[in-house]
Structure formats: C-alpha cells, structure tokens
Amino acid sequence: MNIIKFFHIIHNLYFKQKYFIKRKYYSSEGEDLFLKEKLNLKKKGFYVDVGAYHPIRHNNTMILYQNGWRGINIDANEFSIDLFNFIRPEDENFNIAISDKSEKIDFYSSKKHDPQSTANKIFLKHDYIDKNRKYKKKEIEAKTLNDVLKNSKYNGQQIDFLNIDVQGYDYKVLKSLDFKVYKPKYICIEIQFINEKEIMDFLEYNKYQRIWTGINSNIFEKIE
C-alpha cells in the first residue's frame, strides 16, 4: 500500500469516522439494533454485504463482526474495499459490481467515495441529473453474486444475513443469487421507487416475509 492511500485510510477512519470510539450501533436507520435483538449473536454467523460502502459509517454488519461473525463485503468503489481490507482483514472483500449476469456496466458517481454511486439510469436521473449534481461515468466489471460466492471460501454455505444497498440495482442483485443453495435467513434491502413490485414479488415467491421497515431499508425473514 502506498503512503498516500494509507494516509487517506487513516484520515477517513480515525479523524472523520472516529473508529476508536466503540458505538452501540453503526447503521443509518437502526437496522443493526433490530438485528442484534433478532439474531443469536452468541452463535457465529455468515453475512454477505453488497454495496457495503464503508466498514463503519451507515454499516449494518459492523456489530456482527464485533461479535465474531465473518463474511463477504462487496463494493464497486475501490476506496471502500481499501477501508474494509484495513479494518476487517478477516472478511473477504471484493472490489466489483454485482448484476444478474457477468458483463461490463456503466457506473456513475460524483466523487471518489460516494454513497450514492449507482449503475441504474433511473436512479441517476432522480439523484444526479434532476438535482443538477455533477457526476462521472466509468465502465466497470460486474459479476453475479453466485460467481463471487463460488470463488470464495464460503462456496455453498448458507447465508445467515444478506444486506443489499446498491441504489436501484437491488433487484438485479437478488436475481443473481441461487436461493436454493444459499437460502439467506434474513435479508435487509433498500426499497425505494425502483423495482418495488418486482422485489416484493420476488421475495414473496421465495417465501420471505417483511418483519421490519425503516425509511428506505426493509428486513425480511425466511419462512420455514
């Protein structure tokens, strides 16, 4: 790691986010507080976080990590994965986009580390163009979630908690996972104005019921 990248990581984690201060929660809407009550944290579990963005800020899996859980963090932003590699070296961290097929996709963001980065053109218009926000476009590689899992040490392992937050690409992420193999017990997903019906129908078809609702986030539980 070069010295400039190391400085940016330290500045972000210790000066901006104050990593050294342990918190009761890290999520933006209280998702992790609900999960902490719902999940048996005495048992070590396996999570997958797609659109992980930051290991501390607005993060739904940091509390799980602190309680011995381990998993996979995925983000299309390179700096996001630099942060995860620094803070969570025991996780597997992948700098890649997730879609319903392996392909090259256009990725839009306004700055180096943007929580609103998106590959969805409807979201781009709503959150960037209509608000006169400047953005940059670049072409990046996308794989299916199945492909990432198959090439990880968790191949074939049931997912205890799946978190998806990819600004309008959430439905494509869901479709990229084999639910007969990985069978997530709990799913947290943002449902905004894009693909709401498709997401709800998909989860209902796969026997999930909604058990918690925030401003944008929704948590679903697998019905046995």
Predicted feature residues:
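Phosphate/nucleotide-binding beta-alpha loop and adjacent structural elements of enzyme active sites
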Residues: 1-224
